């Protein structure tokens, strides 16, 4: 008598498993007590699809389409059904940005973080959609921790409230004693934000515009930052009061690097124990987030995505959240010792250093090339499985860094 094949319900999931998908599912389902199982499954499938696409070497202008992503989903269904599955995931109202922040923190830092690290917040525009990104510095790039996408015309109250809430949501996922050192650009130099961060005990560093008015200690007449005299190569530090009415006490660090068009005016909470040199070094890392935005738009092909409707921002947010794990894995692949062999094989270095390096390929590019070049793909696949096993044990991607970020020893005088 022939064995009858089990009859599958029409709506049953027909998943095409392999070692990579099993490891992805095992890693993500370990967090099923925090996040719905259906959401974790969809993130695993999208991660698998994007890694599959990485096996074809992508150029700097490689655009990505939702149709290409849907074709690579590990589902034993037709192309139309896979597209519908992807679209249902992007329209899932239960997938809010804040519920995945703890997962991203655990994947980036591990579950036993004991050091304070630099964290950057900045904003960019993707296809007309405003995008906020918070991430940790890693090998000249940023490990994504939190995203928030929005349309300016649809903001109900204030973008300032959205930014502050995103900062709080990210910071709340870290132990109090090792909360990251937040690095901000000039657009965030608001006294209201500084007061909030001080009251909440969150360390920060923010660059200010030269037109900002400050008051030196013991003086009643204020002056703009641009009126402070400084020569190229100099580094100065002052105790100041920020804002004419609030008079928020801050430390001002002015640095005029050689070859710079204008000085940096950096503000930190009053009494910060970091030296002026260390503060300047930390702010210099802010360029990492610009490189991170370029990665998402070009190497990952996000700028090629098209979303229709009056408010496409939530769908872009969910897709970026789903892309985060594949981005973390490719960064890790490009920052191992084995990646140095790939770099020597594919990279043509600059004759003159640019931004302090002669490299022309980022760790993300090296990670993607490891997957796509036949000469290195087998070893890269094994390393990928090994990374997923370590992530499942509570390790973080940041531990694969060849030159791990130095911990910030910080204390504030009360």
Locate predicted features:
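DNA-recognition alpha helix
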Residues: 66-76
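Short beta-strand scaffold segments in enzyme catalytic cores
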Residues: 132-136
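Single, function-defining residue in the core of a domain
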Residues: 1-63, 77, 82, 100-104, ...
